[in-house]
């Protein structure tokens, strides 16, 4: 992923240069008495909507973003799922409560869940 970048309009307009599908991660800092850590939210942006998707979070408590251009809508969903699992979902480093779902009309399945189910259900 590219970034992290400051989540401000001028930076978004500068670094988001392509109108292709993408996945993104926005982050905020959580603090405890002993340490601070990033907590984030994953999202996906269909063809040409990354700027708009990021800008809707400008007034939130998220402060930085990373993104990755991905070729094709199924690949966007696959990448978002992989990141969701790698970051531990809501029990880990994400605010996303729910596992990513494919867009309406997509028949793709999560590559991680599908792989795990295949191993346990021959």
Where are these regions (language model features)?
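Boundary/linker segments flanking structured domains
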Residues: 1-36, 42-122
């Amino acid at each position: 992923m590219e970034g992290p970048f400051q989540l401000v309009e001028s930076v978004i307009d500068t670094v988001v240069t392509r109108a292709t599908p993408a996945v993104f991660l926005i982050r905020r800092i959580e603090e405890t008495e002993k340490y601070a850590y990033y907590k984030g939210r994953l999202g996906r942006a269909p063809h040409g909507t990354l700027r708009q998707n990021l800008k809707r979070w400008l007034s939130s408590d998220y402060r930085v973003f990373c993104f990755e251009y991905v070729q094709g809508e199924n690949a966007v969903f696959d990448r978002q799922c992989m990141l969701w699992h790698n970051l531990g979902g809501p029990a880990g480093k994400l605010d996303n409560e729910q596992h990513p779902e494919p867009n309406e009309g997509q028949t793709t399945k999560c590559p991680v869940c599908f792989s795990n189910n295949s191993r346990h259900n021959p």
